[in-house]
Structures are given as C-alpha cells and as structure tokens.
C-alpha cells in the first residue's frame, strides 16, 4: 500500500449526507461508486467505497489488458468512518483542536491529478475542512495549486507554503 491521505472537519462530525455529497462529486467527475454499505452505516462501522471511471472499466474488460497500462488517476478507494475513531485524531493548527479524520484515501500515489480535481470541487462545498497527506492543505492551498498550470504531479508531498 502506498501513501494514504485523510480529510478532517471541525465541530460536528460528518453524516451520511456528507458521504452522499462526496459520491456526487465523484459522479460529476465521471467516476462511479461501488455503493454505500447501509448496514455498516447504521452500526457506525467503517467501510470502503471504490470509485472507477469508464476508461478504467474499458481497460479492465479488455481481453488484452496489461495491469501496468492502468492510469492510477482512473480509480481510487476511500474509507468512510461514520463514527469518530481516536486512533485517527490529529491536531489541526488551522482548526485549533484535535479532530478525527472521517475519510481516508487509500494509496494516493499516482492519483494526484484525480485528487486535486476532487479536492478543488470538495472545498467549494466544505471550505473549512482540511486535507492531509504529509502536510496539511486548506481550501486556499488547493485553489492556488489548481490555478497554477501545468499541475505539479507531486503536490501532495510538498509543503503548501511553497505553492
């Protein structure tokens, strides 16, 4: 497994409606989800959702596909935590408190373009949230990076103060 990343929200913990918004963002980006696990949502257990786009599906279904021909920006897996976990709590300076992550993005390595597009859309709806890989990224950080073309493919591993 490669580098993972997390989302944080100050104050009231997230709900299923927040997950619906996240699924909707990916859908508008032409990604399709495996679906929510209603049973785990009701019990508060974490679960994963895979998002893939048509390009990935066509390659996967091709009889002659080569695993190394996949573009990692065509798929991503998230883990949603309906209830906060102490093991996922971090102190977020811009929030001034310790908060739990509610989404973990699995293996973001090679998925930086996909993630940047997602975060740009996400932060329009949730401007106070914070994204973290090695560094903490706010809406302002993502907006600066998104506006600067061509996109830096290694942005998720660099200090946002350098953008």
Segments and roles (model prediction):
Residues 28-104:
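Short, intrinsically disordered low-complexity segments
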Residues 19-21, 92, 133, 144:
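General "foldedness" signal
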Residues 1-48, 162-163:
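Short, extreme N-terminal segment that most often corresponds to the first beta-strand
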Residues 8, 104-105:
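Residues at structural and domain junctions
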Residues 17, 63, 73, 127-128:
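Intrinsic disorder/low-complexity signal
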Residues 106-110:
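Exposed beta-sheet edge/beta-hairpin loop segments within beta-rich domains
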Residues 16, 112-113:
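Loop/helix-junction capping segments adjacent to catalytic residues or to phosphate/diphosphate-binding pockets
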Residues 1-4, 9, 28, 113-163:
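Acidic, proline/glycine-rich low-complexity IDRs
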